[in-house]
UniProtKB/Swiss-Prot annotation:
One Pfam family linked to the record: Ribosomal_L3
Name recorded for this polypeptide: Large ribosomal subunit protein uL3
UniProt similarity note: Belongs to the universal ribosomal protein uL3 family.
Stored SUPFAM superfamilies: Translation proteins
Post-translational modification: Methylated by PrmB.
Annotated organism of origin: Vibrio parahaemolyticus serotype O3:K6 (strain RIMD 2210633)
Length: 209
């Protein structure tokens, strides 16, 4: 399913003709350039590789420089892949713009969530706190028991405990596209999308639409 790589600009609001305020996230989509076309014969699956934005020449290593030169496209800030469905065809060097979503109403947006550092179980996993009084003096935000006794005699993998929170890949599904601004290469998406301002986001047609 083909999508676009964008950059989260921030949030604002737009008004409908009835005067209703809609909170929107602005996503800037610089032209996505196709840097490679993968086929069943050569790669075992069909996909396109795209790059977006630009990168300083002194930040492009030799492997990247050769790859982009072969494709005849400007070096971008990263490489992403989109799987192709039957019958879809693209050429190396082709550009994908926001007009791809002119007929799309709902999208899934993937980004890297804001990093929040080391957090306890209450903030990280929404554990309820223990009693604030009634003899409790040190364990207000402690997680409580983390297992049983001699059997099994260990803590199970995946146990929800304190640890690093955020800075992970997150997808928010079924967000509504409020406006497609082809002139300024902007997508206005209703509500919040994952990640910090300036972060890369992947916008795809919604799978559950």
């Amino acid at each position: 399913m083909i999508g676009l790589i964008g950059r989260k600009v921030g949030m604002t609001r737009v008004f409908t003709e009835e005067g209703v305020s809609i909170p929107v996230t602005v996503v800037e989509v610089e032209a996505n350039r196709v840097s490679q076309v993968k086929t069943l014969e050569t790669d075992g699956y069909a996909a396109i590789q795209v790059t977006a934005g630009s990168k300083k020449a002194n930040r492009v290593n030799k492997a990247e420089a050769g790859h982009f030169a072969k494709a005849g496209v400007e070096a971008g800030r990263g490489l992403w892949e989109f799987r192709l469905e039957n019958g879809e065809e693209f050429e190396v060097g082709a550009e994908l713009t926001v007009e791809l979503f002119n007929e799309t109403k709902k999208v899934d947006v993937t980004g890297t969530s804001k990093g929040k550092g080391f957090q306890g179980a209450v903030k990280r996993w929404n554990f309820r706190t223990q009693d604030m009084t009634h003899g409790n003096s040190l364990s207000h935000r402690a997680p409580g028991s983390i297992g049983q006794c001699q059997t099994p005699g260990r803590v199970f993998k995946g146990k929800k405990m304190a640890g690093h929170m955020g800075a992970e890949r997150v997808t928010t599904q079924n967000l509504e596209i409020v406006r497609v601004d082809a002139e300024r290469n902007l997508l206005l998406i209703k509500g919040a999308v994952p990640g910090a301002t300036g972060g890369n986001v992947i916008v795809k047609p919604a799978v559950k639409a």
